[in-house]
């Protein structure tokens, strides 16, 4: 996956080996402007799953802690070697940018992936075991929706290209990525990939998640707060749109999800089907 993600779009161009080594010896170190920052972060993110799951495989196969630590080091060393190899192969795929920055980003991703397993891996295993062992359908739905909520938060922050100075922030405003209007500019923009309809759909799982919890007045506060906090978190991310109309649409989606859970006696029997769970995990 790391190789495939690092070579997209696949556009092979043959290069002589002598030229490839000459270019490799001259790969630059770039000053990371806002245009390159998202690509740099992506190079780190693409290595995290490989490091995370390979460390997890070693963790599960060997019960001895010293061996687990040793194999984590082996995984880290192997992926650290793989990162510059991938960067070297990118010389044959000219749409890809080859730089020392990307090598550093890949190494950071390896360290983060291994560290994330050691911090969260055991909890993830226990949660998955509880999910499989329980026969409580509502609890299973709650875990599935909770995972969707975490994915939504990650999507809302991706590609993590934070603005670092006032000029970049003004450029984001100039591009129309901050909008304080209560309604979208046009009806057509409501259905775009960055429009309010997407915000409504993104926040619907949060309403379902809160609705499945015990009924508390505080949950209603969270239904209003979560859409606002998500949009607020997107303000310092250069490529993300933060709009008041999305806050309103998100609140509608959250309350819609909450309302669906309050009438779940009508639809929850349909959820207890094999095709629902297969589709949910896909």
Q: Positions of the model-derived regions?
A:
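Bulky hydrophobic segments
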Residues: 1-282
């Amino acid at each position: 996956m790391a190789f495939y993600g690092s070579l997209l779009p696949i556009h092979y161009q043959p290069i002589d080996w002598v030229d490839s080594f000459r270019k490799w010896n001259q790969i630059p170190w770039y000053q990371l402007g806002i245009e390159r920052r998202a690509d740099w972060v992506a190079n780190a993110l693409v290595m995290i799953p490989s490091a995370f799951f390979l460390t997890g495989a070693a963790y599960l196969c060997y019960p001895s802690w010293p061996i687990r630590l040793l194999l984590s080091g082996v995984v880290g060393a192997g992926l650290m070697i793989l990162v510059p190899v991938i960067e070297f192969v990118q010389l044959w795929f000219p749409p890809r940018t080859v730089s020392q920055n990307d090598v550093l980003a890949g190494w950071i991703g390896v360290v983060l992936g291994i560290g994330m397993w050691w911090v969260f891996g055991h909890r993830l295993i226990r949660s998955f075991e509880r999910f499989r062992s329980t026969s409580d359908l509502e609890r299973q739905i709650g875990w599935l929706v909770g995972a969707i909520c975490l994915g939504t938060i990650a999507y809302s922050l991706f590609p993590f290209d934070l603005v670092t100075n006032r000029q970049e922030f003004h450029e984001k405003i100039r591009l129309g990525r901050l909008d304080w209007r209560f309604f979208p500019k046009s009806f057509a923009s409501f259905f775009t990939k960055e429009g309010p309809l997407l915000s409504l759909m993104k926040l619907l799982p949060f309403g379902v998640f809160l609705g499945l919890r015990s009924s508390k007045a505080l949950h209603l506060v969270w239904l209003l707060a979560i859409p606002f906090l998500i949009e607020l978190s997107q303000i310092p991310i250069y490529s993300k749109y933060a709009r008041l109309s999305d806050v309103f649409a998100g609140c509608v989606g959250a309350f819609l999800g909450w309302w669906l859970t309050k009438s779940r006696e009508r639809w929850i029997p349909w959820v207890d089907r094999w095709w629902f769970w297969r589709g949910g995990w896909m």
